[in-house]
UniProtKB/Swiss-Prot annotation:
Entry-linked SUPFAM superfamilies: Urease, beta-subunit
Protein name: Urease subunit beta
Pathway recorded for this protein: Nitrogen metabolism; urea degradation; CO(2) and NH(3) from urea (urease route): step 1/1
Source domain of life: Bacteria
Length: 101
């Protein structure tokens, strides 16, 4: 073994297997780009992002950890969200939940 060497298992790795997902169409109504990270509670994103917020409650972007999606001003795109796991207790972000989902 070499320090830092990666030894992935054979085959494909499926992210968030078996978890509930939902797709939402998002429009950036602002005049600046907005970037949303992989583990940000999507319901609590920047108010300039227009989408069905209630559909996103308890969900985050279904992308690899440590990555993000950027929404340019005036851009509309559909993204897939995945249900938050664990105890499903949310604190911080924009302070809209501050407890159990």
């Amino acid at each position: 073994m070499i320090p830092g060497e990666l030894m992935p298992a054979d085959g494909e790795i499926e992210l968030n297997a078996g978890r509930a997902t939902v797709s939402v169409t998002v429009a950036n109504t602002g005049d600046r780009p907005i970037q949303v990270g992989s583990h940000f509670h999507f319901y609590e994103t920047n108010a300039a992002l227009a989408f069905e917020r209630e559909a996103a409650r308890g969900f985050r972007l279904n992308i690899a950890a440590g990555t993000a999606v950027r929404f340019e001003p005036g851009q509309t795109r559909t993204v897939e969200l995945v249900a938050l796991a664990g105890d499903r207790i949310v604190y911080g972000f924009n302070g809209k939940i501050m407890g159990a989902l």
